[in-house]
Swiss-Prot record:
This is Cell division topological specificity factor. GO terms for biological process: cell division; regulation of division septum assembly. The gene is minE. Prevents the cell division inhibition by proteins MinC and MinD at internal division sites while permitting inhibition at polar sites. This ensures cell division at the proper site by restricting the formation of a division septum at the midpoint of the long axis of the cell. Gene3D superfamilies: Cell division topological specificity factor MinE. Keywords: Cell cycle, Cell division. It comes from the Bacteria. Belongs to the MinE family.
Length: 95
């Protein structure tokens, strides 16, 4: 790594990815269900992808544990010109 790349500001995507990796590592050590954050992240991304086009590395999920309660925080960076997907038409059964 050169001095120039060290001084260059990092993008939010790489910072978010690094934070998520730290959270995942922490969860694996602390929790009996190491896949909880991974599962939640994938399910949340799949639901969001049905409605809006968003880059996967722009989603940050944080799980904080307190006394008797856990808090799940989700930060999603939407571009200004986000593409909203139209709702799919569903066929209803005629009764």
């Amino acid at each position: 790594m050169s001095v120039l790349t060290f001084l260059k500001p990092r993008g939010s995507g790489s910072v978010a990815r690094e934070r998520l990796q730290l959270i995942l590592a922490h969860e694996r050590v602390e929790n009996g269900r190491p896949d909880l954050i991974i599962t939640l992240r994938e399910e949340i991304l799949n639901v969001i992808a049905k409605h809006v086009t968003v880059e996967r590395d722009k989603v940050q999920i944080k799980l904080e544990r307190g006394e008797g309660v856990s808090t799940l925080g989700v930060d999603i960076e939407f571009p200004v010109d986000a593409v909203i997907k139209p709702k799919a038409k569903t066929k209803r059964a005629i009764a």
